[in-house]
């Protein structure tokens, strides 16, 4: 990641009257490791629900590859568990396909390629990891490439975007894809707010959010003291989003040497660090239509907590 982007984002967010920083700032190797631990918690359902979806519907998904040669592209590499279920199904059915995961982290790509090669070493799996920004990577793949594409955008990454940002993201994807290409995209559905509060309030989520302060200290020579902040997430019924905050437990001034600035916190002043919007099916239908896609099928887990929605490009 370019340092100036990190620095500019931090300065802009901490200068707001209501301080707010995007959650992508948390993700370095340690931040990713903490989040992987979160996905294994009993109360944190999205990863478990999505793995169930892939195990239940992998045969249906594999049929999309049988009619024409297809390139499987994944935005964000993750740990490969969900994708592995689909890849195994495709290999067992003798389907020919190319798999290209795209991630800005070289370590994440190298780790995923290693895991998949170990699991499918006796197969003819054609995998090429790409270290790049999503759009730069997708543009390099689609240029002069007429293979049909199946793009996977799994997990809750889109849920973490503001609705206008989500629309902008999807419209950019649409521009890079060809008519009748597929997009399989994960959505966390609206549910009992008590379940949401349980999912986002625990020691690991606090550790994850506080790691943001470590990153600012490390990258920008700041002096945040994590012991002077506590984390709490709340469901906001107006925005239909779980919003996570760090609360300053005292009046304090933070020095950020690389930015040549001081940031003041009042006692119990908040810094918003995360947001995760919860969707209805109607929301998803509208989002697909406004972004240039049509929904061909929705795949749910047994509790209907989560949906992987299969979209096709309209042009």
Residue ranges and their predicted role:
Residues 103-107:
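Conserved SAM/SAH-binding beta-strand->alpha-helix loop
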């Amino acid at each position: 990641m370019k340092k100036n982007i990190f620095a500019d984002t931090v300065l802009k967010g901490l200068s707001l009257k209501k301080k707010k920083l995007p959650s992508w700032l948390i993700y370095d190797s340690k931040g990713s490791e903490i989040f992987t631990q979160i996905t294994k918690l009993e109360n944190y359902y999205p990863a478990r629900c999505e793995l169930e979806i892939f195990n239940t519907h992998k045969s249906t998904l594999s049929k999309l590859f049988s009619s024409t040669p297809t390139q499987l592209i994944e935005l964000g590499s993750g740990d490969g568990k969900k994708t592995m279920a689909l890849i195994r199904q495709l290999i067992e059915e003798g389907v020919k396909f190319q798999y290209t995961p795209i991630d800005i982290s070289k370590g994440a790509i190298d780790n995923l390629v290693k895991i998949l090669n170990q699991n499918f070493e006796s197969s003819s799996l054609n995998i090429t990891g790409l270290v790049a920004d999503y759009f730069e990577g997708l543009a390099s793949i689609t240029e002069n490439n007429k293979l049909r594409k199946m793009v996977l955008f799994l997990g809750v990454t889109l849920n973490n975007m503001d609705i206008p940002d989500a629309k902008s993201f999807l419209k950019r994807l649409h521009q890079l894809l060809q008519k009748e290409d597929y997009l399989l995209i994960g959505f966390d559905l609206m549910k009992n707010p008590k379940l949401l509060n349980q999912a986002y309030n625990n020691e690991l989520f606090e550790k994850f959010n506080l790691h943001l302060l470590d990153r600012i200290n490390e990258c920008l020579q700041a002096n945040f003291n994590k012991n002077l902040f506590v984390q709490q997430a709340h469901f906001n019924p107006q925005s239909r989003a779980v919003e996570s905050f760090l609360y300053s437990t005292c009046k304090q001034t933070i020095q950020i040497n690389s930015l040549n600035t001081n940031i003041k916190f009042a006692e119990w002043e908040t810094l918003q660090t995360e947001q995760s919007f919860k969707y209805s099916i109607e929301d998803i239908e509208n989002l697909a239509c406004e972004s240039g896609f049509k929904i061909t099928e929705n795949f749910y887990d047994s509790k209907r907590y989560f949906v992987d929605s299969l979209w096709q490009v309209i042009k």
